[in-house]
């Protein structure tokens, strides 16, 4: 699914997102949600140079907005599952970047759009591996696509570290409610 798909619910959702931002109702989006936020706010969504499936490092951008959201954190391992990416919409600031996908997250005031998945659980990882097996096979030569064994290696410790970052982001976001 793409934010660019011609589905009957996308245009009303984009308008809903624009209205929420205009009224300063805090919004948060993960992956497709981040892409929809970007598009609603004047950004674009297009194919990423490579498919990203599995674990990968993202870096915290070197700017004050990123520091407000992530403190002194420099980089962390996160989960990815996408073939498209968003541009940073006008007025927003990139707060996370990656080797294979430059725009991993942006902030616009109290609003947070992410390409990466900080919300993962062990059950989600296993479910996505099972339901995405064909996609993993199709894109296995991508430098950013992992196999099931790689994704599940040390799964709980990886998730524990990721949840520390997620808590930081969600705490910052929910403080604005």
Where are the regions that the model predicts?
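Generic recognition of short, well-ordered alpha-helical segments
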Residues: 8-11, 32, 40, 90-91, ...
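Glycine-rich, phosphate-binding/catalytic loops in enzymes
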Residues: 9-14, 45-46, 96-97, 130-132
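Catalytic nucleophile loop
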Residues: 20-44
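Acyltransferase
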Residues: 120-177
């Amino acid at each position: 699914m793409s934010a660019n798909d011609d589905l009957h619910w996308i245009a009303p959702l984009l308008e809903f997102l624009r209205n929420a931002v205009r009224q300063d109702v805090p919004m948060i989006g993960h992956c497709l949600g981040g892409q929809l936020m970007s598009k609603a706010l004047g950004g674009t969504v297009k194919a990423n140079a490579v498919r990203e499936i599995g674990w990968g490092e993202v870096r915290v951008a070197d700017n004050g907005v990123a520091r407000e959201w992530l403190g002194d954190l420099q980089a962390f391992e996160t989960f990815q599952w996408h073939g498209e990416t968003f541009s940073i919409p006008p007025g927003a600031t990139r707060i996370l970047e990656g080797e294979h996908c430059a725009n991993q997250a942006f902030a616009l005031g109290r609003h947070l759009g992410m390409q990466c998945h900080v919300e993962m659980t062990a059950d989600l990882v296993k479910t996505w591996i099972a339901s995405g097996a064909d996609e993993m096979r199709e894109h296995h030569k991508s430098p950013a696509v992992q196999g099931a064994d790689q994704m599940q290696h040390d799964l709980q410790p990886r998730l524990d570290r990721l949840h520390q970052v997620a808590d930081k982001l969600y705490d910052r976001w929910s403080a604005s409610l």
